């Protein structure tokens, strides 16, 4: 999708805020712990290349979702370690090795397939994934992990790390978290040849369970200034939300009582009122269920009326503002603020999803 630079809808990304957020977490965790910046999904919509470059002096490496995301960073000149968190099938190994990209291996079936395809792992750096209770990918016993590590070494791989992922680190009830932690610790204790790096801490674990950190952390949503729990748990230190979203009024008119607005005529004016049109819609990630939510104009909350269209939405105004008047969808406007978490709560989803749905059609300004 092409970025639309010739309309007023833009996302502004504060790279300094991201750097300061990472620094705040690093002060909170034990000394000597390695930091991986999680920049998958285009750095949660913030721009993977720009964020990675900004964090280059602060972090030890990066985590991405797939090989294409890793190659994007390499092609941009990022020379630190890049770990693919998802599973890379053996037929892509050559490209990973050629670009010094670390891969995750999560099953003995992977080894069987690599041998079937006569793939060697010489020069390949690997982190082994353990399923301690998340239920997606990973091995479930020390016996399996020992066999996998031995097999990988036979194929020439460097098994650098082993890791797991917690399902409920961002929840007040830590029963499941503790079950997973004990499972992982027991599995690690049963290894015959423990890898150099052991990591289980995502953003939530890093800030609320810092006493359980091994020797590396993976910092995702906290880097971008958002609470991993939404608003369920209090942050131990302040964060700065790094992305703001703004547009401008491109059309303003008066409508009369009985006039309708939008597809499906879901809004009917009860009296004469001013309506403004803003050039952002569900193709930009501003979803249709945002009808009834508010944006900020001149420090005032203005309700979205009528259905959100593909490219536009309409808002009720208190007066006839001039064309070009700033509209804030995420961020501050004259001491009033709309956070990504506010939007997530309205949509009954999580702040991660709100950011990741912001499409490439919205230019990112740094």
From Swiss-Prot:
Substrate binds at residues 136, 310. The modification N6-(pyridoxal phosphate)lysine is found at residue 40. Its cofactor is pyridoxal 5'-phosphate. Signal peptide: none annotated. CDD domains: PLPDE_III_AR (cd00430). GO terms for cellular component: cytosol. GO terms for molecular function: alanine racemase activity; pyridoxal phosphate binding. It catalyses: L-alanine = D-alanine. PROSITE patterns: ALANINE_RACEMASE. GO terms for biological process: D-alanine biosynthetic process; peptidoglycan biosynthetic process. Keywords: Isomerase, Pyridoxal phosphate. Its EC number is 5.1.1.1. InterPro entries: Ala_racemase, Ala_racemase/Decarboxylase_C, Ala_racemase_C, Ala_racemase_N, Ala_racemase_pyridoxalP-BS, PLP-binding_barrel. The active site is at 40 (proton acceptor), 263 (proton acceptor). Pathway: Amino-acid biosynthesis; D-alanine biosynthesis; D-alanine from L-alanine: step 1/1. The keyword Isomerase applies. Belongs to the alanine racemase family. Catalyzes the interconversion of L-alanine and D-alanine. May also act on other amino acids. This is Alanine racemase. The lineage of its organism: Bacteria, Bacillati, Bacillota, Bacilli, Lactobacillales.
């Amino acid at each position: 999708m092409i970025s639309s630079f010739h309309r007023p809808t833009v996302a502004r990304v504060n790279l300094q805020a991201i750097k300061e957020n990472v620094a705040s977490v690093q002060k909170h965790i034990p000394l000597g712990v390695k930091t991986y910046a999680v920049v998958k999904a285009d750095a949660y919509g913030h721009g993977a290349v720009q964020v990675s470059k900004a964090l280059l002096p602060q972090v030890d490496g990066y985590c991405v979702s797939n090989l294409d995301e890793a190659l994007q960073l390499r092609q941009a000149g990022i020379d630190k370690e890049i770990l693919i968190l998802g599973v890379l099938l053996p037929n892509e190994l050559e490209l990973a090795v050629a670009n010094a990209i670390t891969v995750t291996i999560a099953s003995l079936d992977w080894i069987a397939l690599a041998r079937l395809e006569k793939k060697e792992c010489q020069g390949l750096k690997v982190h082994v994934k353990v399923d301690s209770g998340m239920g997606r990918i990973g091995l479930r016993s020390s016996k399996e992990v020992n066999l996998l590590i031995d097999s990988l070494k036979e194929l020439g791989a460097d098994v650098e790390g082993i890791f797991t992922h917690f399902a409920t680190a961002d929840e007040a009830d830590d029963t499941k978290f503790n079950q997973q932690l004990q499972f992982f610790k027991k599995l690690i204790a049963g290894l015959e040849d423990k890898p150099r790096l052991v990591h289980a801490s995502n953003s939530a674990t890093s800030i609320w369970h810092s006493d359980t950190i091994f020797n590396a952390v993976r910092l995702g949503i906290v880097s971008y200034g958002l609470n991993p729990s939404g608003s369920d748990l209090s942050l131990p230190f302040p964060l700065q939300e790094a992305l703001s979203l703004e547009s401008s009024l491109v059309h303003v008119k008066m409508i009369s009582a009985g006039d309708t607005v939008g597809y499906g005529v879901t809004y009917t004016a009860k009296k004469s009122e001013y309506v403004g049109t803003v050039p952002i819609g569900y193709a930009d990630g501003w979803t249709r269920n945002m009808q009834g939510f508010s944006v900020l104009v001149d420090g005032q909350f203005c309700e979205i009326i009528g259905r959100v269209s593909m490219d536009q939405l309409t808002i009720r105004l208190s007066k006839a503002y001039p064309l070009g008047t700033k509209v804030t969808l995420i961020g501050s406007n004259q001491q009033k603020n709309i956070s990504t978490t506010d939007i997530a709560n309205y949509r009954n989803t999580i702040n991660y999803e709100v950011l990741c749905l912001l499409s490439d059609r919205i230019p990112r300004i740094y």
